[in-house]
Swiss-Prot record:
It comes from the Bacteria. Its main location: cytoplasm. It comes from Xylella fastidiosa (strain 9a5c). This is SsrA-binding protein. Residues 139-167 are annotated as: Disordered. Keywords: Cytoplasm, RNA-binding. GO terms for cellular component: cytosol.
């Protein structure tokens, strides 16, 4: 029997790709441009992420000494975490990007007043990656306008469905 055909291979049980989403970022910022970055993690953090214990809601990225760091993102340690290693769930983590990407992000943050916001954390080939976005903060009236627009889209869909049922 030939085992080289794809239908003969056992199905791989992969974990879901998305680990965490930052839904607040879409509500509070205008997201302009997205970039993929790696994360410098410790072993206990990877285990905690596999268990689904990551939260990006309060996280943001900042520039220090020509490098970009993630601050405020929470990775809650597992109960079984080692006792001799002090696990700080909100520690500052280095973001891994190419030098050219870092330089362009630094330039846009410093010159144009953008903020770097984490929008998603996901798996890519057994590595944890983070999507960071260049963002501008929304004013209160922008948030209200976006909410009204969403409500109108929902109402429009309801009206169209009701009209199509009656036709």
């Amino acid at each position: 029997m030939n085992n080289k055909h794809p239908e003969n291979k056992a199905k791989s049980t992969t974990t879901p790709k998305t680990i965490a989403l930052n839904k607040r970022a879409r509500h509070e910022y205008h997201l302009i441009e997205r970039h993929e970055a790696g994360l410098e993690l410790q072993g206990w953090e990877v285990k905690a992420i596999r268990a689904g214990r990551a939260n990006l809601a309060d996280g943001y990225a900042y520039v220090r000494d020509g490098e970009i760091f993630l601050i405020g993102a929470q990775i809650t340690p597992l109960i079984q975490a080692s006792t001799h290693v002090v696990a700080n769930d909100r520690r500052t983590r280095k973001l891994l990007l190419h030098r050219r990407q870092i330089d362009t992000l630094i330039g846009r943050v410093q010159r144009e007043g953008f903020t770097l916001v984490p929008t998603a954390m996901y798996w890519s080939k057994n590595r944890v990656k983070m999507e960071i976005a260049l963002a501008k903060g929304k004013q209160a009236h922008d948030k209200r306008h976006a909410e009204k627009e969403r409500e109108w889209q929902r109402d429009k869909q309801r009206i169209m469905r009701a009209h199509n049922r009656n036709a």
